[in-house]
Amino acid sequence: MGGELTNPNKSDKEVLSIYSVGDNSYGNIYYLNNKELNIKRLFMDNYYQCFAIDNNNNLYSWGLNNYYQLANGKNSKYLFNTNESDSKKTNQSNFSIISSSSNNTIIKTIKNIGNIFSSPSSIPMEVSKIKTISCGDGFTLFLTNNGLVYSVGRNDKGQLGYELNSNTALIVDGILCNNKLTCIEYFVKNKINIDNIICGADFCFALESLNIDEDGDIEYNGIYSWGNNELNQLGIEENKYKYYFNPIKADLVTKILNKQRTKIKKLVCGWSHSCLLTKNNMIYLWGNPFKEYNKNYKNIKEPININKIKNSKITQISSGFNHIAVLSKFYNSKIELYTFGANEFGQLGYPTEEIFIDQFNKVEIPKTELNENLEIKKIECGAYHTLIQMGNNLIYGFGQNNCKQIGNYQDEFLSSPKKWNYIIDNNKDKILYDIKCSNSISCLLYKTRPENKEEKNEEKIIEDKIDEKIMVNSLRTEDVPLNKII
C-alpha cells in the first residue's frame, strides 16, 4: 500500500518525476499529473484521498471527501485541480489512460466526476510538524514529529480514536463525522509518544517508539489499536465490543512478540486483516482476509505465523485489500516473490482456479534477455494488483487491470506478471527511484541519472522517505501510437 515519500538527502538540483496511471474517478490521477505542481512530499494509500506538501510548505488534499476525510472542513465530494475546459475532458471515456498532446493533458476517467472544484484544498495545519499521514476508508490520520496523532472523517466504527458528541458532530448518511483535525487525547493523557501509524479500512494501529537497534531499524515498544474489531483485526484479547472508540493495547500481538523475544519490523493492514513482519523472520496474521470469499472461514483472533517459506529471510512485505506479497531472500540465491490470499482478480500472480489460497506460493517472472540477471528490488500492492520493481527501470505487474494500472493490455485481470508497457518520455536520463500503488492507481517515481560515473549504477530504493522537488509527467504506451490513444 502506498504511503509517504520523502528524501533525507534533499538536493535542489535534482528533480524527481512522477508518472501515474489508473482510476481517475475522484481526480487523483489528474493532480498527480499536473505539470505545474512542485510537490516535495506525497501521501497516498489504498483509498481515494491524497495529500501533498509543496515546495512552499503548503499542505493540500484532493480526491474523495464524502466524509470530510480531506481535512479541509468542507463537504464537497470531490476536490482536484482543473478548469472548465478540462472538466469537459474528464467525462468522456470508459478507461483511464493519461496522455499528452501539445501542452494539453487528456484524462479519461472510469465514471463521471460530478462536482468539480477549481483548486486543491489547503489544510490549516503547521506543515513542519507532520511526520506522516495514513488513509483509511473515509477517514485520515496525521502523525506529528512530537508523537501526537490527529484524525478526521467518519467515526461510525471508532476510526477516529475518540467518541463524537451526537449533538455537535456532523452527520453524513446517518454516520457521525468530524470535519476538523482533532488530537487523539488517549496518547496525550498517557504520555505515549507515537512513532508510526497504519490504517486498515476502518481500524487503526499506532506504534510507540523505543530506540534504534544496531541495524538502524526502529524498535517499537508498544502497539495500540482502535476501530472495527468485528473480525478480530485489532489483535486484542478483550472482546466486549464490536467497535473500540479509544485506543487499546494490542495485547495479543504484544504477547506473541514477548514469547518469541522479537520486535516489530513492519506492520501492514488490508481491508479486514492485519499482518506483522518481525525481526526474527515471522509473519503473523490476524483478522479475516477471506470472509467475503468463504463464510465458513473463521476469524483469526490470536496472531498466527503464516511464514512457511524455509531457509530464507523475508526482506519486504506489502498488503492489498485481501492479498499479501513478500520478498524472500534465499541463502546463496536470488530474491524471490511469494503471495498469499485472495485471487479473484489474479492478484496472486500465478494461474489457479482458486479464489483464495491461505499459504504462500512462488510467483514466476518471465525470463527475458532484459531481466535475466536482475533481482527484484521492491514490491508494492494496490487494492487488487501488485507492482514489481527490478533493475534497469523494469516494471512488472499482475492482478486487476480494469483501469490499465498494470499496462495497456486488453485483459482486465492479469494472473501472471506482465511487463509494464508504457514508455516514459525522455527516460534515458532517469533512474527508477520508487514505485507506489493506490486503490487502482500505479505511480512510478524517477530521479535524474547522476553524471558522476561512480553513481551511475546506483538504483537504491528508499522505501520510506523521499523529499525532493517533484515534477509530474504523462504516459504513453509502447504498442499504441499517441494519437490513437487520444
Question: Would you name each region that the model predicts?
Answer:
Residues 2-36, 63-121, 153-180, 208, ...:
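Short glycine/serine- and acidic-residue-enriched loop/turn motifs that recur at repeat junctions
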Residues 20, 48-52, 61, 139-142, ...:
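Conserved core positions of repeat-based scaffolds
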Residues 23-27, 37-51:
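Beta-strand-rich domains and repeat architectures in extracellular enzymes and scaffolds
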Residues 32-35, 123-125, 187-189, 257-258, ...:
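Surface loop/turn motifs at the tips and blade-to-blade linkers of beta-strand repeat domains
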Residues 58, 148, 213-222, 282-285, ...:
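Structural motif
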Residues 321, 378-402:
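Loop/turn-rich, solvent-exposed surfaces of beta-rich toroidal or solenoidal domains
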Residues 418-421, 429-452, 473-476:
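Blade-level signature of beta-propeller repeat domains, shared across WD40, Kelch, NHL, RCC1
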